């Protein structure tokens, strides 16, 4: 008997149907000499410090450097007792262990990527299994995709380096996260301040951008915009920046008296704008956030659902390209869209006999190719699923279309010894832009940044030496703009291209192709920062909370917050996967770094905050214990608890102090109701310690929460 281990029950069922394992058992499917079971994600993890005898946060325990690391079943929090093994994980591990002992060999069908490999290998090692295994490596869960994969199983040993990379990533996260968190928390003296190899530099980027935005001093500047007409066509020219308003006004008056300009030079260039490549996961997340305000995690979950329904290929991809063999399937996918009512109009603009092969590059395909639809056309999608599917389908149509051909004209005018620029664009062949898809117009964005304006206007024929009449002169009042706050789209882009933001050229070259995190993990990093109350969403922007900013102030000068160092680690993990770096060498470097980082934190002199003392409003005896998420009475007979997150807003120490001293907080704006609507209210304390809302316009209206 062969055992097939999938990552999720839904995937196991698809594979079981194809291999003929139709008999349902507890935790697996049986039949045709196959047992198909599943892992429920990470069933096995690295043990917590308690497994190494390090209970609690104590200076003398640090740094904790396990040799070797211990594997344990998935751990879940247990009230007042730390952590315990997840009963569901224990049950499924027992089932897998039983099947492994009975089988002759194993087929690994966890997700084809670094984390999927780690899920299987940790289970395999924890159960001390010695059975031979092969790898099912597929990008599509369609019947064709699974059958092709099963017919072309690869030897498990071919993925040993992928596992080594995944293992060292997991261990590095443990070393840095556990030790840095404990060391900083000890240095602060109270509370837990979580740090991480990837989350901390990401937090640093958000905080740094927020400070740059907040402290930016806007400066006014002015530009003169001239209106012209020739051959019944109106067009505009614009000056360079003028810092002095009086100078701009004086020039305006002079031009109104002498309303003529001369063409100094003019040039035309035919530009071919190549179509965009396919989406990788980060590209999809960025565009979905920009266009539809989907969070990165939401987009990933929707894409994963579409994948499991067999409508798209594997979503956690870092490539925008496809291989030559996959290219053979593209015409069939185009015809599928041409025959569908929803996509027929756009798809019929694509010429099957002249498809653009720019996205074909075997060398740039990583674990998986760029995102594609499958030959299975979707039915009964939710609105959000349909949005993501349409993005992927439309991008495919764009990617195989002809270039957009434009004639770009730049003309320089001179009036009263002042230069004025005229820019115009005429589309000669719409090409991929006729698809009308989701790709943002970077050209338009760039022209806005350059303050050149009107760059897409259609121009008449302009000849050097020609005199052009000025019909109107307008002063444009503008201000320099601060760096924009990060949206999720912007932060994903910054994480993806972390090296490109560095000023040092050598560092940029070193980190080319490396970023912070991976396409599969970036959404989770952002969600972790939100969950830990380090950042928050404000409209479409991500901004640091007071807690997040405090952590940043402590760590901003340290290497743990350094984008370059984190990017370099990602680069080293890639080298391990490619066989260019020894895993042991990476481990030694990480241990040395952990020692240094821990020593730095423990030597920090952080001023201790005066502890807030609040008498329990219920029993009136004990002082409340203040935790990040709750304030509670230590007297178990009293049992008073106040949750510190109310309708999406945290009750800070300052708000708690005001609430218990004055019986009422200041007005808190932007709280969210269960229906998702926002409201403003005061939080009031009643005599029995319970709280209620008081609304500013109807002070008599209170409701318990």
Language model segments and positions:
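Conserved short loop/turn motifs at secondary-structure junctions
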Residues: 1-3, 111-112, 189-194, 268-277, ...
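Basic, low-complexity terminal or inter-domain segments flanking catalytic cores
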Residues: 2, 25, 82, 89, ...
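Short strand-coil-strand connectors
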Residues: 30-32, 227-231, 414-418, 675
């Amino acid at each position: 008997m062969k055992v097939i281990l999938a990552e999720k029950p839904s995937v196991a069922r698809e594979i079981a149907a194809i291999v003929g394992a139709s008999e349902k058992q507890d935790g697996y499917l049986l039949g045709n000499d196959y047992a198909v079971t599943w892992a429920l994600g990470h069933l096995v993890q690295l043990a917590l410090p308690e497994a190494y005898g390090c209970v609690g946060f104590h200076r003398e325990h640090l740094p904790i450097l396990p040799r070797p690391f211990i594997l344990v079943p998935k751990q879940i929090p247990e009230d007042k007792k730390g952590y315990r093994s997840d009963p569901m994980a224990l049950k499924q591990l027992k089932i897998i262990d039983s099947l492994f002992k009975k089988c002759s060999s194993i087929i690994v069908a966890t997700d084809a990527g670094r984390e999927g490999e780690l899920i299987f290998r940790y289970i395999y090692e924890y159960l001390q299994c010695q059975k031979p295994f092969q790898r099912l490596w597929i990008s599509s869960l369609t019947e064709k995709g699974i059958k092709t994969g099963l017919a072309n199983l690869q030897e498990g040993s071919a993925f040993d380096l992928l596992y080594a990379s995944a293992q060292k990533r997991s261990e590095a996260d443990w070393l840095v996260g556990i030790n840095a968190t404990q060391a900083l928390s000890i240095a602060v003296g109270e509370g837990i301040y979580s740090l991480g190899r990837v989350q901390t530099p990401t937090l640093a980027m958000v905080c740094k951008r927020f400070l740059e935005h907040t402290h930016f001093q806007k400066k006014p500047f002015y530009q003169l915009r001239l209106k012209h007409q020739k051959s019944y066509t109106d067009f505009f020219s614009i000056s360079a920046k003028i810092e002095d308003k009086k100078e701009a006004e004086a020039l305006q008056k002079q031009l109104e008296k002498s309303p003529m300009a001369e063409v100094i030079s003019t040039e035309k260039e035919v530009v071919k704008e190549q179509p965009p490549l396919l989406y990788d996961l980060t590209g999809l997340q960025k565009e979905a956030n920009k266009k539809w305000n989907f969070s990165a995690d939401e987009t990933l979950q929707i894409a994963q659902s579409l994948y499991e329904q067999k409508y798209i290929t594997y979503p956690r991809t870092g490539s925008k390209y496809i291989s030559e063999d996959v290219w053979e399937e593209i015409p069939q996918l185009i015809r599928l869209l041409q025959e569908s009512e929803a996509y027929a109009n756009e798809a019929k603009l694509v010429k099957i006999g002249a498809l653009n092969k720019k996205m074909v590059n075997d060398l740039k395909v990583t674990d998986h190719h760029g995102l594609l639809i499958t030959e299975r056309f979707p039915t009964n999608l939710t609105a959000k699923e349909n949005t993501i599917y349409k993005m992927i389908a439309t991008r495919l149509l764009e990617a195989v279309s002809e270039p957009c051909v434009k004639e770009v004209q730049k003309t320089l005018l001179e009036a009263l010894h002042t230069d004025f620029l005229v820019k115009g664009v005429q589309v000669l062949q719409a090409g991929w832009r006729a698809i009308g898809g989701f790709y943002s117009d970077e050209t338009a964005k760039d022209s806005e940044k350059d303050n050149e304006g009107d760059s897409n206007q259609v121009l008449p024929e302009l000849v050097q030496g020609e005199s052009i009449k000025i019909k109107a002169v307008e002063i444009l009042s503008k201000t320099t703009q601060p760096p924009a706050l990060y949206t999720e789209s912007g932060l994903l882009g910054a994480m993806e291209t972390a090296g490109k933001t560095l000023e040092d050229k050598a560092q940029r070259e070193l980190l080319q192709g490396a970023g912070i995190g991976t396409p599969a993990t970036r959404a989770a990093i952002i969600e972790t920062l939100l969950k830990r109350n380090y950042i928050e969403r404000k409209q479409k922007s991500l901004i640091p909370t007071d807690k997040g900013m405090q952590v940043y102030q402590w760590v901003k000068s340290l290497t743990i917050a350094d984008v370059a160092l984190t990017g370099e680690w990602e680069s080293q993990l890639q080298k391990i996967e490619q066989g260019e770096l020894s895993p042991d060498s990476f481990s030694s470097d990480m241990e040395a770094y952990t020692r240094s980082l821990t020593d730095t934190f423990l030597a920090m002199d952080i001023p201790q905050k005066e502890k807030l003392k609040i008498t329990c409003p219920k029993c009136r005896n004990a002082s409340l214990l203040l935790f990040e998420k709750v304030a509670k009475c230590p007297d178990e007979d009293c049992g008073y608890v106040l949750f510190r997150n109310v309708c999406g807003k945290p009750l800070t120490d300052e708000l708690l102090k005001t609430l218990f001293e004055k019986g009422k907080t200041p007005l808190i704006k932007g709280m969210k109701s269960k229906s998702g609507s926002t409201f403003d209210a005061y939080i009031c304390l009643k005599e029995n310690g319970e709280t209620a809302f008081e609304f500013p316009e109807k002070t008599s209206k209170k409701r318990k929460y």
